[in-house]
Each structure stands twice: as C-alpha cells, then as structure tokens.
C-alpha cells in the first residue's frame, strides 16, 4: 500500500477529471504555444502593454451630467461619438464593427478597443524600452484629446469607477460581452463589477523555450500579488472608499476557479504547454464563438452562452484555427495567461508615469538573467496554496503582511522599488 509520503501528488490530475478534450484541439493549442517561442540569440525580449481607461464626465460637459460619472457607449456624447470623431486619424482598414456599431480603431503602433462597460483600452505595439511606450502613449493622447474635450469626457487611470455604480453602466453592443455579463451575473460574485466598472494595466513578455515559459509563469504568478500591492490603485468601489486593499484580486478570487487565479497545475513538476492547453480546452467555454468556424457558416446565433459546453462540444473534430484558439484562451483570466506570449494581469489601471515604473521593473526582473534567477530563487518550491496565502495575507494585513515569510521591504529591495513605487534598479 502506498503511503502519503510515497505519493507524488500532481495538482493538475484533480482538475478537469472527465478529460473531455479533443486530441486535435489539444495539439492545436499546444502548437500555438510552441509557435510563441522566440530565438534568444540577439533578442532582448519585447514588452507588450495594454492600458485601460475609465471614461467619466468632465465638470463642463454638454449633457450636464455630474462631474466624474461614468460615460457609456451609446449615450449622447458618449464613447461611440468619441470613436467616430477619431476615425479620420486611424487606418480605415483596422476599424472594428459589430453590426453597425464602431467598437475599435487601429493604426501603426496603436490599437483602441472597448471593454464591456465602454472602458477605452489602448494596446501598443511591442516596445523594448520605457521610452518607446511613452512615445506611443503621447501619440494616443494627442489624437484623442480634442474628441474627449468636445464630448465632455476625461480618461481616469484607476482600478474602478470613482463615483458610478456598476449596475448603472450599460454593456456595449458586443454579443460576447453581453453573454459574459449574463453568465457572470448568475455564476459568479463581482463579475459584473469587473466587467462594467474596472480597469487594468497588462504587460506581456516573451519566452525562449517551454521551460522558460513555465519558469516565467511560475515566478510571475508568485510575485504578482506583491507587485499588485505595491502598485495598487483602486481607492473607490461603488461610489465609496474601497474596503479592499487589493480590489482587483478580490474580484478574480470570486469569479471562478480554473478560469481565474492561479493556473491549475502550474506548480506541478511536469507542467508544460500540454497541461496549459488542457486547462483552456477542458473548462466550459462560458461563451461559444463560431463566427470564424466554416462548418457553422450558416449558424444564426454564432455567439452564445456555453455554461457547460467546452471546446470539444462546440468545435469540429479537426485542428483549430487561430481565431478559435484565441477565443478559447480569451475565456480564461488567470493571473498569468499563456498565449503565444505571457500576459501578466495583476494590476489596476495606472497613470502613464506609474505604468513606466512598473514596466521597467518587469523588464529587469524577467529579462535580466541574473535578476530573474535571484527573484525565482526566493519563490522556488512554493505551491498554489502558498500563493493563495500570500494574496490573503496582503488583503488582510496590508503593510504588515509577510509574503512567503518575508517583510515587504525585502521584496521592495529585491524588485528595485522605492516605497513610492519608483523603480530604482538594483
């Protein structure tokens, strides 16, 4: 008889226990991850940045709304009007519509899209320095400034709407988001708050092998709550002072296991691209999207709620195309998300100055080999429960927390941060 001491428990083995995954789908997603491997020779590592902005009314606005209230998509002088005014400054070939509704714009270096509550997300082309991000962001602000002033809108870079309630913010006319809103309204806590009224900063990094990807995912997942605490920026929740030190973390903790939080099985010794692919394929899709699935070309309802169906239930028995893969991955919101790059997702929206400090810190920790080795050594051997303890400790004890048994000043020194969040390096 085996004893507990003899057994090697792999966390992943106890997720998705029916193993209902199509082998061709599994290979498609694993190949998608493999295709993201960059050549380390002569490649310093790129940085992708997305900044979400909360649109609120200015003091002197044309609809006489109270200052600071959320601006929705369809209202008079709303976000749709802002996008329409910007069209001439962006590439017509990159306009994004759903039906007659303009939902996105793009040009070289910059892509504008909308989050469910009309939050304006700006995604930038890959940069290799903080200066590159600052130049692109200045271009974005210069382009959008006159349209914002005309419609009485200002962009707030915080984690949550300062005055408005989430229930007062309409979801934009995108079927995927309306399905998600309905799903989260019944299947989770705080899901609608996250969708309609929150905003974040996300930073993406490259990987140079499967082993490098796993190491960066583990280190990013372990250090993420600490960095989230140092860069926290959600002073408000539902029109009041926020009772949560880490509001965004509180949302994701309650939205659903496997779909959010720590990637299942990440700290198992055998975790790799195949397990990452299993995670996204075996989970219920939440939203099924077959708009780019040729076999469903005549489907009258190509985007629908899929509360129980997973990829094998929805997509044909063949290799998945890139649109299908990207959609399946996008229905998961783990702290660190693997695509054909690694997306670090812990942070509230931040002003550009603080975003630059965060970017410099991330670049140093994940691309300086000596710094990465040192940072990883302090979280080596941890488990998922240790990450959860770290999150809870920061939420409960704040400055007195001891992430992984060490005081916050230790982590500041390791990450090269001053107490005000300025990156000073090591």
Locations of the language-model features?
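Conserved, mostly hydrophobic/aromatic
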Residues: 53, 203, 344
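Glycine-/small-residue-rich active-site loops that bind phosphorylated ligands and cofactors
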Residues: 129, 208, 350
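Long, well-ordered mid-to-C-terminal structural blocks that present hydrophobic/aromatic surfaces
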Residues: 299-386
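Short helix/loop capping segments that flank catalytic or ligand/cofactor-binding pockets
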Residues: 63-64, 130-132, 213-215, 228, ...
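Loop-rich catalytic cores of soluble enzymes, especially ATP-dependent carboxylate-amine ligases
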Residues: 149-150, 154-337
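Terminal catalytic/cofactor-binding subdomain
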Residues: 2-189, 197, 354, 358-367, ...
